[in-house]
Amino acid sequence: MNFSSLKQGQVAVVQAERSTGIVLEPSGQQAFGSTKAFRSFDSLVAARAFAQGLVNTKPNVECGLYDCSGAHLERIVSTR
């Protein structure tokens, strides 16, 4: 996935189906061929809060957090 639209310090949140790993668009639809299947945040704290809230309400979804270089920062899943 290309995160070149992110600026230094921004974080991308990529959501995926937990059971299949299929990446989802921000709308929740499967992102086959999508060019922007992530949400961007200005900080890791904001990205983490969004991702935690999402997986708490949708335990079948997991989130990956990435920096502007594409480095994986962390994976967030529901604890339920």
Located regions from the model:
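Short aromatic-glycine-(Arg/Gly/Cys) micro-motifs in beta-strand/loop hairpins
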Residues: 2-36, 64-68
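Low-complexity, intrinsically disordered short peptide segments enriched in small/polar/basic residues
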Residues: 8-11, 19-20, 52, 58, ...
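Short, mixed-charge low-complexity intrinsically disordered segments
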Residues: 56-80
